[in-house]
Regions:
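Short, surface-exposed loop or secondary-structure junction motifs
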Residues: 2-114
Length: 114
């Protein structure tokens, strides 16, 4: 079904792709991981429904969109964000984790009430 997934369907969460962050959060984010681990997880998940059939939030789609932007622009995603969004909007205190990795607050997570 990959040939049926479009940029638009990834943008509006109708691609059918799963969410690599969801149930794989603990496996992927205990330590820093590279693009290969994330791509392998997305590939292993496959699709949950045919593109256009449903709407479901997908970090996987947005991750793939960021990789596509990097390939087309030949620049890292964090640089593209700064040049095209945060810089133009004057958002001096908004940044990518790649710009300041030591200033990142750990997200909340479901740990079964513990």
């Amino acid at each position: 079904n990959a040939d049926k997934i479009t940029l638009e369907s990834m943008l509006n969460h109708t691609s059918g792709l799963g969410d690599y962050v969801g149930e794989h959060y603990h496996k992927l984010f205990k330590k820093p991981v590279g693009n290969k681990a994330i791509l392998d997880t997305i590939k292993a998940q496959g699709v949950e429904f045919l593109p256009g059939e449903k709407t479901r939030y997908s970090n996987s789609g947005y991750y793939l969109l960021s990789r596509i932007l990097e390939k087309v622009a030949k620049k890292p995603y964090n640089v593209l964000l700064k040049e095209n969004i945060t810089g133009k909007a004057g958002m001096k205190n908004t940044f990518s984790v790649l710009d300041h990795p030591t200033n990142v607050f750990k997200s909340y997570e479901n740990n079964g009430g513990n």
